[in-house]
Amino acid sequence: MIWKARSAALRRPTLCLTSSQAMYWASEGIFTDITKQIDGLDNKDDLQQGHIEAGTVDGAEYTLPFITDVSVMVWNKELYKKAGLDPDKGPSSISEFVEQAKKVAALNEDGVAGSYLAGQSGGALVFDLFPSVWADGETVLNDDGTEATLNNDSMKGVLDAYKELANTTNGLGAGSKEETGATWTAPFANGKIGVMPYPNTSTTALFDAEKDGGFEVGVTPIPGTKEGKTSTFLGGDAMGISKDSKHVAQAWNFLSWLMSNDAQKKVFADNGDTASNIQTLKTAYKDADPRVQTINSVIIDGNGKTPKSAAFNEAFNAAGSPWQLLIQNAVWGKSDLKADNQAITDVLDQ
């Protein structure tokens, strides 16, 4: 149903979708300022805030959430049993993540690894790694997105964790260093990875495969370096109204309707997709798989974030970005976090 909703939106030429580039498009004048309309919503506080904040420039609001895709931690319960781990307990800290991944690695089974990382995909890497930094209460960018703040203890702890796995036999799946994101989720889906961060939009396929006799999957929020603290990357698509639209009122009617609890239930919850309305997440999934409720909880708890920078794509997502090079250096090479952080800032502040 996500694609039906997306297609319906795209048939309206006045509506535009964006992801991590919301601030860029807003600052370039692509969207209509709908601050008054958004602030006038009775349920604004019930909406997932990441996509609203990402599309806010100089106090003006341009976007609302449409498709919400969040990152969670998944693990293979079958491999956990073989490794002598509790199959019902995923990692509650980065140190536990490493410990559990190394236990699976020690099975020394053909093609099986503790974890997996998309080493050449800046987008997958921010989706996987930023939540652990946020969980610790640290930041990845300054407020206006012009400076990287990755030179902190939490980021270092996360990078050290993956470096430890990279230096462990079977710690990271073969191809992690070269993974462009094209087959990022496949190794876990194929039953070859113990535990890794994962997009919630891909978990449905895991659950369906499980019903057909596949391995059982565990799901938990992504932890930080401090036990019990979690966060998520609020990804997906935000939606705004084109600056050139001659039908702003009609477009707003559609957007305001889509934000309502009733519409969120019909369009998203009833079709097994993730709503962006907190009240819908709390009330419309009571009969859903408990793991779906766990996924929803990472949005409900309000700890998730969407990074905000006009130059986010160039600094993080683009092939060969300074962020991608930071990961390559920190996990598989010689790390200089201060210098690599500055290289990201140099792009952000152009």
Describe the residue ranges of each PLM region.
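A structural signal for short loop-to-beta-strand junctions that line the ligand-binding cleft
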Residues: 5-6, 11-14, 41-79, 229-231, ...
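Short, solvent-exposed loop/beta-turn-alpha elements that line the ligand-binding surface or hinge
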Residues: 32-47, 89-92, 108, 113-122, ...
